[in-house]
């Protein structure tokens, strides 16, 4: 009986703590959350993100932000953005990735309330600013940005990209 009670208590505490936000659809983070998105909005954003990454040719090298990686996992070259934008090919040469896919909506959604998301967003913003010369926007859809290496910018995507970057939350720690 004692062991059954201990197991029951550990399951209750483990599931109610919502590890890594995996149960957020079922267990809210709070009664009155600072950022809320309905399941329908989440579904629409997911569909937009998948449609955006489908514009990247299948055999291209990609650097993607964390929420997009599972959808691109079958790629021969897939690295995590913002930590890497270059990879070493089979010949031992360093190569820039052809495409970058970033879900800015995901990273900015909780940036005001969660320090981890705020740090990730700042790192992403800094890296994106440094890539303006090499990469140009090809598509911006519901906060998902697709950038291509050494190509002519899509004017509509470039404008949407600049607007999106300006709308991102500003890091309060840097201003003080």
What do these predicted regions represent?
Residues 1-26:
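Signature aromatic-anchored transmembrane alpha helix within multi-pass, membrane-resident enzymes
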């Amino acid at each position: 009986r004692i062991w059954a009670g201990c197991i029951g208590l550990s399951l209750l505490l483990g599931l109610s703590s919502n590890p890594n936000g995996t149960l957020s659809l079922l267990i809210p983070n709070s009664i009155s959350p600072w950022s809320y998105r309905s399941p329908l909005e989440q579904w629409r954003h997911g569909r937009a993100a998948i449609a955006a990454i489908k514009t990247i040719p299948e055999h291209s090298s990609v650097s993607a932000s964390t929420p997009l990686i599972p959808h691109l996992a079958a790629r021969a070259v897939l690295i995590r953005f913002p930590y890497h934008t270059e990879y070493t090919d089979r010949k031992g040469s360093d190569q820039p990735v052809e495409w970058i896919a970033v879900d800015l909506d995901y990273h900015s959604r909780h940036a005001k309330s969660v320090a981890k998301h705020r740090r990730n967003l700042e790192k992403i913003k800094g890296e994106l600013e440094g890539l303006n010369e090499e990469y140009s926007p090809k598509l911006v859809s519901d906060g998902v940005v697709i950038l291509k290496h050494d190509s002519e910018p899509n004017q509509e995507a470039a404008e949407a990209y600049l607007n999106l970057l300006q709308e991102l939350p500003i890091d309060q720690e840097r201003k003080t």
